[in-house]
Amino acid sequence: MDASFLETLHGIAGAAGQALLEMYGAASLPVDYKGPGDPVTAADRRSNRLIVEGLNQAFPGIPVVAEESEPASFKGFHEAERVFFVDPLDGTQEFIRRNGEFAVMIGLVEGRRAVAGVVDAPVTGVTWVGAVGLGAWRIDPEAGRRAPVRVSAIDAVARASIVASRSHRSARLERALASLGAREVRPLGSAGLKGAQVAEGVAEAYVDTGASTKRWDACAIDALVTAAGGRVSDVTGASIDYRGPTLANERGLVVSNGLTHEAILAKLARHVPPQPR
């Protein structure tokens, strides 16, 4: 893993982001549904195709598990040492609403842990990249800046800013967020954008107690936040297992600056989802 690897991922994510922007301004955007509350558009599929093709060309032999690919293409990824997890349009509902809160995410797993991640925000042009052991950066082409990022030093939940889903707000999540007693809880679309806010110290944590997110929602921000000095786990404190039997984050997702993590887990203990059978 080196800087050139991250630059290649950055380029692939950026190209997909530009393709999304071309469709973002379309007068109409037909929407299909994979399930209740789970929309998909031609933009999702176009970005998915561009990323998968780009990764296959740049890194042949590394399997790609991408949200809009056919599940049959995932076959064998459990046995591979390295695997890419891709969300080609993270925040489809926000894309449809045109509020700007969506991202492109590419993450790399080695063994069982996320080691590299890229989160690209097409509307602002900002990209966050990180690799465990190398560090994390915020790249802002418009400002001509590439700056290292680090999680915040706030160590009390009462002084913390928490970000949570804008579009997926269950009663259980609302109760869990209220139980934290944080300084503020802010709604924000896109798991990637929420994770990026934690990585650069704008927020102290991102909390999701449900099972709606998948491994491709977690992988890039897992690597990014870890590289920036934070911590990522499920609501029980266990690391995300990218080689597990399911692609769903069935026990939720907690992304933090690390200093507030244990306190958040303790407060969430009453809201832990039932153990999957």
Regions found by a protein language model. Name each.
Residues 1-11, 175-180, 195-277:
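Oxyanion/phosphate-interacting regions
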Residues 1-89, 175-179, 238, 259-277:
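N-terminal subdomain of lithium-sensitive/metallo-dependent phosphomonoesterases centered on the IMPase/IPPase/PAP
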Residues 20, 44, 55, 92, ...:
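Residue-level signal for inorganic ion chemistry
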Residues 34, 67, 165, 188-190, ...:
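Conserved beta-strand termini and adjacent loop/short-helix elements that scaffold enzyme active sites
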Residues 106-196, 202, 250-277:
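Acidic beta-strand-loop-alpha-helix segment within the catalytic core
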